[in-house]
Amino acid sequence: ARRRHSMKKKRKSVRRRKTRKNQRKRKNSLGRSFKAHGFLKQPPRFRP
């Protein structure tokens, strides 16, 4: 059964979801880089 043109599914706009995903990814990468650079292993006075 071939779909008619009027029955074609509209795509949802991806922009909002993509932005939220990028924000989450940025936050995770920031936390990972903080641990990687050893900020948490330094004495308490050097912590940001």
Swiss-Prot record:
<keyword id="KW-0221">Differentiation</keyword>
<keyword id="KW-0539">Nucleus</keyword>
<keyword id="KW-0238">DNA-binding</keyword>
<comment type="function">
    <text>Protamines substitute for histones in the chromatin of sperm during the haploid phase of spermatogenesis. They compact sperm DNA into a highly condensed, stable and inactive complex.</text>
</comment>
<dbReference type="GO" id="GO:0005634">
    <property type="term" value="C:nucleus"/>
</dbReference>
<keyword id="KW-0544">Nucleosome core</keyword>
<keyword id="KW-0744">Spermatogenesis</keyword>
<dbReference type="InterPro" id="IPR012601">
    <property type="entry name" value="Spermatozal_protamine_typ"/>
</dbReference>
<dbReference type="GO" id="GO:0007076">
    <property type="term" value="P:mitotic chromosome condensation"/>
</dbReference>
<dbReference type="GO" id="GO:0007283">
    <property type="term" value="P:spermatogenesis"/>
</dbReference>
<keyword id="KW-0158">Chromosome</keyword>
<dbReference type="Pfam" id="PF08188">
    <property type="entry name" value="Protamine_3"/>
</dbReference>
<dbReference type="GO" id="GO:0000228">
    <property type="term" value="C:nuclear chromosome"/>
</dbReference>
<protein>
    <recommendedName>
        <fullName>Sperm protamine R3 isoform 2</fullName>
    </recommendedName>
</protein>
<dbReference type="GO" id="GO:0035092">
    <property type="term" value="P:sperm DNA condensation"/>
</dbReference>
<keyword id="KW-0217">Developmental protein</keyword>
<dbReference type="GO" id="GO:0000786">
    <property type="term" value="C:nucleosome"/>
</dbReference>
<dbReference type="GO" id="GO:0003677">
    <property type="term" value="F:DNA binding"/>
</dbReference>
<keyword id="KW-0226">DNA condensation</keyword>
<feature type="region of interest" description="Disordered">
    <location>
        <begin position="1"/>
        <end position="48"/>
    </location>
</feature>
<feature type="compositionally biased region" description="Basic residues">
    <location>
        <begin position="1"/>
        <end position="29"/>
    </location>
</feature>
<dbReference type="GO" id="GO:0006334">
    <property type="term" value="P:nucleosome assembly"/>
</dbReference>
